[in-house]
């Protein structure tokens, strides 16, 4: 058996934990035997849900009864001490006992604890929260989705480097095509920070990724670009708007196809296509946001997802490690020049 990817798992974070976390691990392991899980949390509860469904050579339980609560502020979560499942799982990456960490817990606390334990990549000032979004041609990396409400032009330029690196690690055969989210596509549109960022990215673009200028909100999923950069406030609003729109569409479609006998017959005749459509809009299949900018990425699962969603966040961990994002980072000169790090 080849060397396994070691994934540290905060089993106590998120709604319905540790049950959904352990079920997510079991679901993922049923189709992927490349991972070794270091599971942090209440040992009795974890063993109950594992129920001997995974061979012990694929996991280890590190027991702790302490956890960060969803209601904690970021500082309250950090002050709960070094014995929480979240802290210990991140610390295991710091100690090189695991390759990457995933948690469905409190987002603010996760970022603070990660920054207390892990180093920032040289010349990167702020980490960014990134995620994969579906588009007409495949997937896009979008960042920042809420880690930084206010950003300088340098921060946004750094995000373009990190986002391009992440996309390249996940899709090695493709060239990252970066765009800056704005209220218009013309160069004169936007505030001063956006305009300064445009100039930085336009002047410093390198062959490692393409810069396509501005992109508007109605173009986020048209597939023309695959890395979209914004500040955390704008990105989070865009994310929540997209999620709400997807839920609205699926809800209205469900009502339309169950309102009459003809509609029900139509839904039966189009079952295969409707199933594909529903799957394409299923947020669980895109679960797994990534804090990048730290010397080891931290994967954040949505706290409200189910075991299938958590399983997908494990897949994200696996792909990040295999794509060598962990071993690539911009040097000071490269970061200033908006140059994407080469693969290890």
Stretches found by the model and what they are:
Residues 150-213:
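Glycine-rich phosphate/diphosphate-binding loop of Rossmann-like nucleotide-binding domains
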Residues 2-45:
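N-terminal phosphate-binding or glycine-rich loops at protein starts, especially the Walker A/P-loop
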Residues 54-98:
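Phosphate/nucleotide-donor binding subsite
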Residues 24-28, 109, 113-129, 196-200, ...:
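A glycine- and small-aliphatic-rich helix-loop capping segment at beta-alpha/alpha-beta transitions
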Residues 93-111, 189, 194-200, 204-277:
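Glycine-rich phosphate-binding loop
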Residues 131-167, 284, 310:
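Short, glycine-/small-residue-rich phosphate/pyrophosphate-handling segment
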Residues 327-332:
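Conserved small/polar residues in nucleotide/adenosyl-binding loops
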